[in-house]
């Protein structure tokens, strides 16, 4: 069964550190990390070494803040 994973972290190496929180509906935590590294690297042009993961947590459907993840959960 799929899990909802929230990843909190920051991007360093730019002019100012950027703090972020991302949510993913995935089967494993490692899948969520891979998607996050890919997304953040392509959108912000940073290397994986410049992305610091501060927290990884599994959350319930009621805790989801991302509207896209929420809509996909409502479909099933």
Curated annotation (Swiss-Prot):
The keyword Membrane does not apply. It comes from the Archaea. Gene3D superfamilies: 3.10.20.10. GO terms for cellular component: ribonucleoprotein complex; ribosome. Keywords: Ribonucleoprotein, Ribosomal protein, RNA-binding, rRNA-binding. Pfam families: Ribosomal_L18A. GO terms for molecular function: large ribosomal subunit rRNA binding; structural constituent of ribosome. One of its GO terms (biological process) is translation. HAMAP family: Ribosomal_eL20. Belongs to the eukaryotic ribosomal protein eL20 family. NCBIfam families: PRK00773.1-1. Part of the 50S ribosomal subunit. Binds 23S rRNA. This is Large ribosomal subunit protein eL20. It comes from Methanococcus vannielii (strain ATCC 35089 / DSM 1224 / JCM 13029 / OCM 148 / SB). The gene is rpl18a.
């Amino acid at each position: 069964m799929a899990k909802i994973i929230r990843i909190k972290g920051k991007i360093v190496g730019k002019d100012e550190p950027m703090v972020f929180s991302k949510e993913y509906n995935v089967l494993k935590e490692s899948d969520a990390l891979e998607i996050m590294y890919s997304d953040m690297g392509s959108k912000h042009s940073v290397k994986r070494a410049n992305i610091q993961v501060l927290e990884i947590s599994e959350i319930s459907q009621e805790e989801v803040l991302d509207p896209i993840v929420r809509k996909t959960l409502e479909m099933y």
